């Protein structure tokens, strides 16, 4: 399942992404905002999407993904990464989309509605969704280091 979320700045982009995913026969769920609200706050939607992705992953659905959109993708990525098990990435090119999946097993894609064209966004989404994690020893080791720190409970150690 692909979970979508956007604040007011990413709302129109999200609606276009829904059309793109539908045309691509990809299953998704829109977690909001469901209507344009100029007063909404991005963390609400970042947490909502990240919590659903994390829950699905914890229940064994390794295909769970999220796509978050705000003005520049920065706030969404910071907020989503506060949820245990989430590896949210801000992507601006097909190459980094590919590497974020191959090297980092990223599970949430963050996009900036005001920083990349929709044409590029579609290419990024297509690349990100179609790229698998490469289980090379060094990538596994690095992800384990991140997960160990995340599970330690004390970010100052």
Could you tell me what each predicted segment is?
Residues 3-12, 16, 94-157:
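C-terminal binding/interaction regions
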Residues 5, 29-32, 66-70:
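Short, conserved beta-strand edge motifs with alternating hydrophobic and charged residues
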Residues 10-11, 35-36, 73-75:
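Short, catalytically relevant binding-site loops at active-site mouths
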Residues 16-26:
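A short, Lys/Arg-enriched amphipathic alpha-helix followed by its capping loop at the start of a domain
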Residues 27-39:
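A short beta-strand-loop structural module common to alpha/beta enzyme folds
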Residues 28, 86-93, 133:
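Short hydrophobic/aromatic-enriched beta-strand-loop microsegments
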Residues 45-89:
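Helix-adjacent hinge/juxtasegments
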């Amino acid at each position: 399942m692909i979970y979508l979320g956007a604040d007011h700045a990413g709302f129109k982009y999200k609606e276009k992404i829904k059309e793109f995913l539908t045309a691509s026969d990809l299953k998704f769920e829109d977690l909001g905002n469901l209507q344009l609200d100029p007063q909404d706050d991005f963390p609400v939607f970042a947490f909502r999407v990240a919590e659903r992705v994390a829950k699905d992953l914890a229940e064994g659905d390794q295909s769970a993904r999220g796509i978050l959109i705000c003005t520049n993708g920065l706030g969404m990525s910071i907020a989503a990464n506060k949820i245990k098990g989430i590896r949210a990435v801000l992507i601006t090119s097909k190459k980094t989309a590919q590497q974020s999946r191959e090297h980092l097993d990223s599970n949430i894609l963050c996009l900036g509605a005001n920083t990349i064209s929709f044409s590029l966004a579609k290419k990024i989404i297509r690349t990100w969704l179609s790229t698998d994690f490469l289980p090379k020893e060094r990538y596994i080791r690095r992800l384990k280091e991140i997960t160990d720190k995340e599970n330690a409970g004390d970010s100052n150690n």
